[in-house]
Swiss-Prot record:
Binds 1 zinc ion. GO terms for biological process: regulation of DNA-templated transcription. Zn(2+) binds at residues 8, 11, 27, 31. This is DNA gyrase inhibitor YacG. The keyword Metal-binding applies. The gene is yacG. Residues 61-71 have a biased composition (Gly residues). Signal peptide: none annotated.
Amino acid sequence: MNMKTVKCPTCGKPVPWTPESRYRPFCSERCKQIDLGAWAAEQYTIPVVEDDDLPPDAPGGESGGASGRLN
């Protein structure tokens, strides 16, 4: 049987995709914490698409808080 593996998003090391892989998709607690720290330091962003066609009462409209929508 072929075991599916994925690359650790932090270091690229192959990680078996099994329930026994405690930190998947990361290879270790260290790589998991490095990734969490990058999110906390705002090194990663989620792109936002500005949408001028939103009605004012729609989420993200003029009265709905932040403008734009997640892409």
